[in-house]
Amino acid sequence: MMFKNFPFFKGKKDTSFDHLVEEVKKGYIPEHIAIIMDGNGRWAKRRAMPRIAGHHEGMQVVKKITKFASKLNVKVLTLYAFSTENWKRPKKEVDYLMKLPEEFLGTFLPELIEENVQVRVIGQQDRLPTHTRRAMEKAMEETKENTGLILNFALNYGSRDEIVSAVQHMMKDSEEGKVRVEDVSEEMLSSYLMTSSLPDPELLIRTSGELRISNFMLWQIAYSEFWFTDVYWPDFTEEHLLNAITDFQHRGRRFGGV
């Protein structure tokens, strides 16, 4: 079932936010939270600003939410940063988006290291500009020994492309005698995906009011709980994330059972 905002905190304004955080942490925290960060352009348009201003503001929110997810002991935070379809956007906007990882990591990497955060990337990295790829590679190298939150960027990522690539690699291994047809299973296909070393997302969040998945982790979200909000990504706060997790904690996850 899909929900929008869950008014759990209504009437609790006299309770400190830190206390609410501690109460939520007593419950089950999703191991893997995936977020479709949507609405940067519309946020900027409403303020008569260029779309890139929305992306810049959204970058600041990534910093804030990453630190908060780490505080909540979330194990994996996957952020849909740039899809394989986003190349269709105006060149000026795409060029700016390709500079954002460099800017983001240039200022935030020391904090990520201090917070014990490990940076990872999924997506077709070979098509990224050299400066973008180098910024991501540097961050991954410098945080690879960290054991805290895994900050996983989906950059030039498309789920259908990922699944096709997985099947191609599986067929190649079959031709080389490494895989037998009778061995093919869900677990085997999962092992060929870019997320093979990560647990599937338990909670998927999408901002901006759009109610669609947009080719994001289609295989991995088979049993994820969805949480939608009308809030644009630049306005997304720690309270919104806490609200989503609280909603998650109040749902009954049956995985096809009763």
Curated annotation (Swiss-Prot):
Gene3D superfamilies: Decaprenyl diphosphate synthase-like
Record-listed Mg(2+) binding positions: D38, E225
GO CC, alphabetical: cytosol
Keyword terms of this UniProt record: Magnesium, Metal-binding, Transferase
Subunit structure and binding partners: Homodimer.
Cofactor annotation remark: Binds 2 magnesium ions per subunit.
Reported function: Catalyzes the condensation of isopentenyl diphosphate (IPP) with allylic pyrophosphates generating different type of terpenoids.
Name of the protein described by the UniProt record: Isoprenyl transferase
Family under the similarity heading: Belongs to the UPP synthase family.
Enzyme Commission numbers on file: 2.5.1.-
Pfam family, one: Prenyltransf
Essential cofactor(s): Mg(2+)
Residues reported to bind substrate: 39-43, 51, 55, 83-85, 87, 89, 206, 212-214
Record-level GO BP terms: polyprenol biosynthetic process
Transmembrane segments: none
GO molecular function per UniProt: ditrans,polycis-undecaprenyl-diphosphate synthase [(2E,6E)-farnesyl-diphosphate specific] activity; magnesium ion binding; manganese ion binding
Enzyme class name: transferase
Active-site residues (renumbered): D38, N86 (proton acceptor)
InterPro entries: UPP_synth-like, UPP_synth-like_CS, UPP_synth-like_sf
